[in-house]
Amino acid sequence: MLLVSAVAVGAVLSGSAQASNYVYDRELGFVARATLRQATEPPRRVPRNQVFRAYVRCYHSERGFERAFEQRYGAPADRVIAYYAGGSEVYLRNTTCRNVHLFIRGRHTIETSAAFSILLHEVLHRQGVRDERITTCLANDAVHAGARLLDFDEKRAVRARELAFHFTKRYSPPEYRMGIPHCRLLNRRTDWTDHRVIER
């Protein structure tokens, strides 16, 4: 009887550990959604209910994130920072979430600015923006809107955006990169709502 109980308790604890591999980070979901709304031009400002809610899943460990990705796609996740798999959830590595929180608190480095842009990138996919190059461009540019929304001054907001662009230029695969002059032109002529594909 004791052995059976121990096995049962072990199974329950194992199931709980599996279920608690991540948390839904409400702050990151709220900030991303507010940033995307702020990133649209005032005359065309998208109504709040047109910016779809995203549930940001932050994993407690790198291994938990990698295991979930590998189970879903059957491919290694060692080079994956974050992803969107349809629905209303976006999936972020532990370090990505931590760096976004540092960005929100005012630490703007290449890593934290990139992490904030990566969060916005995945939430843009949730909004229906599909093309990776355009999504990255829009996310990098929206870092400025997010920094201003978080009450950082113009100089800091511009710097954070430039750091996000620098990270993309330096570290992202070619299919995610758009030349900065082309990206700036795209952002002057359009905003993310022009690039969304809403599946009915």
Identify the role of each PLM range.
Residues M1-L3, V7-V90, V100-L102, E199:
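A metal-dependent hydrolase signature that marks the N-terminal structural subdomain at the beginning
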Residues V23, I104-T109, E122-V129:
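Second-shell loop/turn segments in exported
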Residues D25, G29, G86, T109-S113, ...:
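Alpha-helix initiation and capping sites
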Residues G10, R126-Q127, P174:
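Short N-terminal micro-motifs specific to bacterial/archaeal maturation
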Residues L92-L119:
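Short acidic, glycine/tyrosine-flanked loop/strand segments centered on an H-E-D-like triad
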Residues L2-G10, S113, L120, L186:
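Solvent-exposed, charged interface segments at domain starts and junctions
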Residues S113, S117-R130, T136, N140:
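Active-site recognition of the HExxH zinc-binding catalytic motif
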